[in-house]
């Protein structure tokens, strides 16, 4: 079952069009960028003449001048590698036991055109339709998708990039494979041919992939081990629908838009929807490090990670730091490899400053850095950001995000691109940061993952302190919490009042519930008061895995399995891809993940502080103020904005008519939250943000809410959804293939 015969003609037409639009293509943009970095001259200065004629022969930047030959050789090596670079894209597909309108696939791909605006490719057989949207970085033809084996038996659509694709290419060539392109997509395809499902353990990168094996009538979906790239699926009447974003699946009229009560129960507690749940009944996330195999109208989900024992831990903190030094250097060097403008998201904190330190050592040109700043002493990190930027001489751009920015328009756009509501208000600054980045760069390095690997969050410190607090009689802890309630309300970012109230209440909970409460919003009693369909079972099932661990590690594993992919990485992927920006997180290189998992806890967190191995590594490298500053995160003054610029949006959206019509929440409770917040009797900004984004998202996607007048218990299939995806498997348990 080969590709549709029309696809070849379509590609031929596309190639003809490419000759007409080349002057505005990504290739031309890339050439201009590379020429500027090589010769320090704008392409427009050549006035259409050969570059050598536009530069003085005496100029050191001339091809015949001092250093020019070396620069041309370097440029030639770059050109020779063009096509090896990965590309951003999105994928979609569906099965069909009966013939269907092929425009279905086009509609699904159109919904994610922002992920890959340059090329659309489709594959159709009697059983399956696969498609991809691609943002071409360099290779105009060689990397176009779908990509099939020479015999046409296996077809692949792929989103992401494989950083070790050159190593794998060499290994596969030695095994007899011959390549037709320099694309990493073809390397993934050949790896699957060679090793089958085991191939996914060998991939070092970020990806979501779909492969169709025609001879076996088998579809395989795969997602990278940390969940950097998203992949969703839906099974209905024996057919499967999948895509990089939920909106791909919603283009199919058979797919219900019914609200998932299990997803909403988790969302109200966690601020995000943990996999495999989504906020739409019947649509699921493929869990990180998992495969889905669909055959004969049935699907099976399982982990492709291989269990192994932890490596021998370093004997000392200095030894651990030396090992991390080598791993970080290798990962960042790999991820700097791009023939398009590249920058670094700089927060002025330890993680992003570390990336900049290494990148500056490897980059031959001035690095670009991008930052968001805020008004207000507790929210503004500008002083740290600018100090780090000056130290490394970056070409720096920053945006002060205040009430004058078009916040309401951004919130509406976020509701479209986010696919699911996310009560993490950090989506707003990431939206504006991505927007600013796109004007200057196509790729950005970012520090996601370091906190989850090395114990960098305030919640990890709170977990440690709570273990001590539990030795204090409960009546005394309750008394301390009652006293904390009398503290005056403060709008400071993670101020003393907020931390005291949150910690003392969490100290009255079990360790598992305390961990999520410190980072979430509604406690279980608060949720029961608010939500007509409150049910503790979905969250309890998610938390069960945390009970099997001990100490810090169980909390880190939970954060890596759920919080990182379903909140942090999901937020970054949707906001950046909405602007066609690729964000790379070097800390999530599998080698660093395995290294972190093998470290003893006291190399991560102890009385001396957090992320100790990383701080020790960067000692005497970064400014002391950066090394010693407390963790704050990219947060916004949402409490203040809800009393000011966003108050009309808040009150127009969460009004009595709207709340009663949806039938999800009790209006008196919502009204009380609104009134207490405006009267400064409590800071309910985070809680209200979660309800606001949920309501806007439901309106935008016409999501069907259950009728409050006919309440029913949570469907059992939502409680026990995708059990094979919920088994507790540490994400570090990857093994080299022997």
Predicted regions: what they are:
Residues 4-6, 14, 24, 53, ...:
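Intrinsic-disorder-associated, low-complexity terminal segments enriched in Asp/Asn/His/Tyr and depleted
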Residues 225, 431-491, 563, 568, ...:
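Active-site adenylate/phosphate-handling loop in enzymes that bind or generate adenylated species
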Residues 1-4, 22-23, 35, 40-41, ...:
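N-terminal amphipathic/hydrophobic targeting modules at extreme N-termini
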């Amino acid at each position: 079952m080969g590709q549709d015969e029309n696809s070849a003609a379509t590609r031929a037409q596309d190639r003809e069009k490419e000759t007409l639009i080349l002057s505005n293509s990504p290739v031309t943009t890339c050439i201009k960028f590379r020429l500027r970095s090589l010769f320090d001259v704008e392409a427009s200065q050549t006035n259409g003449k050969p570059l050598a004629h536009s530069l003085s022969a005496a100029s050191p930047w001339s091809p015949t001048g001092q250093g020019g030959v070396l620069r041309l050789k370097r440029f030639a090596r770059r050109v020779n590698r063009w096509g090896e670079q990965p590309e951003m894209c999105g994928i979609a597909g569906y099965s069909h036991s009966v013939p269907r309108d092929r425009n279905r696939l086009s509609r699904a791909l159109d919904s994610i055109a922002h992920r890959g605006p340059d090329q659309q490719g489709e594959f159709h057989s009697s059983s399956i339709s696969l498609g991809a949207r691609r943002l071409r970085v360099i290779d105009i033809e060689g990397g176009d998708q779908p990509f099939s084996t020479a015999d046409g038996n296996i077809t692949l659509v792929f989103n992401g990039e494989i950083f070790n694709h050159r190593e794998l290419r060499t290994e596969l060539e030695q095994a007899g494979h011959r390549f037709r392109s320099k694309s990493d997509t073809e390397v993934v395809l050949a790896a699957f041919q060679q090793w089958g499902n085991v191939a996914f353990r060998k991939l070092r990168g970020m990806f979501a992939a779909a492969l169709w094996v025609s001879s076996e009538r088998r579809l395989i979906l795969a997602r990278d081990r940390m969940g950097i790239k998203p992949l969703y699926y839906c099974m209905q009447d024996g057919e499967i629908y999948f895509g990089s974003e939920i909106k791909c699946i919603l283009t199919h009229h058979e797919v219900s838009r019914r609200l998932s009560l299990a997803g909403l129960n988790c969302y109200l507690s966690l601020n995000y929807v943990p996999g495999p749940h989504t906020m739409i009944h019947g649509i699921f996330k493929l869990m990180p490090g998992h495969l889905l195999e669909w055959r004969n109208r049935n699907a099976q989900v399982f982990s492709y990670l291989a269990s192994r024992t932890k490596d021998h831990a370093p004997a000392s903190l200095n030894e651990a730091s030396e090992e991390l030094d080598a791993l970080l250097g290798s990962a960042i060097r790999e991820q700097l490899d791009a023939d398009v403008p590249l920058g670094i998201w700089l927060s002025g904190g330890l993680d992003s400053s570390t990336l900049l330190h290494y990148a500056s050592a490897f980059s031959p040109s001035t690095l670009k850095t991008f930052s968001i700043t805020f008004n207000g002493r507790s929210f503004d990190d500008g002083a740290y950001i600018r100090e780090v930027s000056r130290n490394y001489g970056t070409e720096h751009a920053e945006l002060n995000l205040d009430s004058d920015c078009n916040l309401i328009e951004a919130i509406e756009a976020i509701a479209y691109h986010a696919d699911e509501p996310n009560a993490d208000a950090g989506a707003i600054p990431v939206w504006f940061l991505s927007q600013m980045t796109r004007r200057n760069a196509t790729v950005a390095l970012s520090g996601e993952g370091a906190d989850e690997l090395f114990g960098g969050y305030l919640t990890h410190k709170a977990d440690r302190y709570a273990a001590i607090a539990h030795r204090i009689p409960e009546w005394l802890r309750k008394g301390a919490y009652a006293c904390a309630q009398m503290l005056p309300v403060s709008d400071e970012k993670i101020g003393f009042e907020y931390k005291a109230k949150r910690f003392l209440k969490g100290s009255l909970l079990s360790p598992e519930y305390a961990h999520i409460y410190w980072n979430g919003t509604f406690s279980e009693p608060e949720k029961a008061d608010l939500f007509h369909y409150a049910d503790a079972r979905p969250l309890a099932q998610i938390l069960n895995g945390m009970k099997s661990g001990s100490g810090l590690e169980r909390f880190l594993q939970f954060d890596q399995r759920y919080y990182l992919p379903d909140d942090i990485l999901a937020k970054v992927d949707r906001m950046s891809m909405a602007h066609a920006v690729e964000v790379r997180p070097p800390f999530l290189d599998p080698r660093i993940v395995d290294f972190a998992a093998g470290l003893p806890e006291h190399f991560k967190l102890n009385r001396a502080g957090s992320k100790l191995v990383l701080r020790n590594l960067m000692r005497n490298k970064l400014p002391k103020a950066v090394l010693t500053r407390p963790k704050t995160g990219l947060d916004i003054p949402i409490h203040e904005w809800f009393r000011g610029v966003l108050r009309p949006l808040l009150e127009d959206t969460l009004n009595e008519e709207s709340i009663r019509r949806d039938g999800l929440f009790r209006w008196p409770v919502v009204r009380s939250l609104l009134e207490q917040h405006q009267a400064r009797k409590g800071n309910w900004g985070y809680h209200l943000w979660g309800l606001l984004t949920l309501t806007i998202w439901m309106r935008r996607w016409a999501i069907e809410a259950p009728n409050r007048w006919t309440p029913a218990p949570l469907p059992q299939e939502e409680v026990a959804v995708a059990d094979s995806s919920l088994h507790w498997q540490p994400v570090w348990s990857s093994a080299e293939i022997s």
